Amino acid sequence: MDFLLGNPFSSPVGQRIERATDGSLRGEDWSLNMEICDIINETEEGPKDAFRAIKKRIVGNKNFHEVMLALTVLETCVKNCGHRFHILVASQDFVESVLVRTILPKNNPPAIVHDKVLTLIQSWADAFRSSPDLTGVVAVYEDLRRKGLEFPMTDLDMLSPIHTPRRSVYSSNSQSGQNSPAVNSPQQMESILHPVTLPSGRDTSSNVPITPTQEQIKKLRSELEVVNGNVKVMSEMLTELVPSQAETSDLELLQELNRTCRAMQQRVLELIPRVQHEQLTEELLLINDNLNNVFLRHERFERVRTGQPVKAPSEAENNLIDLRPSTPPAVRQPEVTNNLSSQLAGMTLGSRSVSAGLHSLDTSGKLEEEFDMFAVTRGSSLAEQRREVKYEDPQATKGLAGALDARQQNTGAEESSASSDGAQLTNWMMRQGMVPVPQANFMEDIEKWLSTDVGESEDGKGVTSEEFDKFLEERAKVADRLPTLSSSSAGTPVSPAAASRHQKQAKEDDAMFAL
């Protein structure tokens, strides 16, 4: 078939591949390799011509230096060319008949060529695993693993992404934008999110423990840093993005990050039980925890974005004590008052002692109103008050005697109806100054004086203010006419009857002036 198509090196790209893989070269010609990639991307027949030329240079060639240069050109083209070239080199036929055939024991290839071929197969299998039309290399890779073939550890220093941005031609009007990279382009996204192949040493399906060397530990830790970087980027995106306002490009990048991190977690889980290194095992476990946490956050993000219903609380949550205030079905809103009795009445304590205390507070409120009336009368003159008030008026309950008498009756009613709890509450309120303290002896003296004063009056009518003023003037005149006691008569003893009358008269005068 190749004979019918002619010489593979006769095409423009074939000629350059022939020069780039010449055995006389001491090393790779990278400028020529990149020129080959440009021709493949820009021409219609470039991928097929390059594929035929590379295949011709590798198959049956005993000059392994040329084979090594051809493998380098092949790797460069896969990393820098598009899907048209990937379909050709990722096919199962090319991988088995060209690459695997080259490293067969009968060909006796050097170790560097053997490792180079296995590295290419492994990296392509990891990169093309999610592409349905590029799974030929994946099938070959899995078959080689089942046969027990050991793949080399990945060298991160030499690792570069499979997919790189295509060559773009900028117009003269867009030269200013040439310096700023397009971070949201699909090619760069694929380049950033290419899953890094963690070292496996042996077939990961077996349980053979791995004791890594110092070089392997260094490479593994550098790869774990890449995993941590992806986890950090995904976590920051979940923090910044709003589920209902996220753009399509951001959601695509987030989904790609999620797939990449899940692929990395599978490799981490394979290494955890096999690595015989305590510190590395701790680092792997920590990375696995971070991956699980970011996956949970992503699931919650998707649940909110898609509007899925939130899970109902479990029965265990319903069994918890509800400390919120319970509201009855029909509650009458109390009126807002500043009265202390109204505030205490709103507290449903259900105790007779509290009822007795509220009754006493209501009584004290009435007394406050009565004393407020006395405060209002202080604005008028004393003569006007005496002309308007009769001291013996039975209806004059605004006086001090009536108020004190009402207070005594209320206090007596409280003491007779209150229980032992009510007495304790009343005593406490008295000590706090909330309820006036009853003065029984003082009340008895006032009542005794009032009854005596009423008995001595000849008529049932009270004394007016004018009569009281006249009485005071007469008393003053009598006092002026009294003789002055001499020093000789000062020591004369006074009879007991006169002393009793004088004392009684003094008490009456004091009581009158007190009113």
Curated annotation (Swiss-Prot):
Regions of compositional bias (Basic and acidic residues) in chain numbering: 505-515
SMART domains given in the database record: VHS
Region feature (Clathrin box): 319-324
Membrane spanning stretches: none
By its UniProt entry, which InterPro entries does this protein fall under? ENTH_VHS, GAT_dom, GAT_sf, TOM1, VHS_dom
Topology class, membrane: Peripheral membrane protein
Locate the VHS domain: which residues?
A: 20-152
Q: According to the UniProt entry, where is the signal peptide?
A: none
- Could you tell me what induces this protein? Expression is cooperatively activated by MYB and CEBPG.
Record's superkingdom?
Eukaryota
Give the PROSITE patterns listed for this entry. GAT, VHS
Which residues fall in a coiled-coil region?
Answer: none
Region: Disordered; residue ranges are: 166-185, 307-333, 480-515
Q: Where is this region: Interaction with MYO6?
A: 397-488
Tell me which family the UniProt entry assigns to this protein. Answer: Belongs to the TOM1 family.
**Protein name per its UniProtKB record:** Target of Myb1 membrane trafficking protein
Q: Which organism does this record belong to?
A: Gallus gallus
Q: Which gene encodes it?
A: TOM1
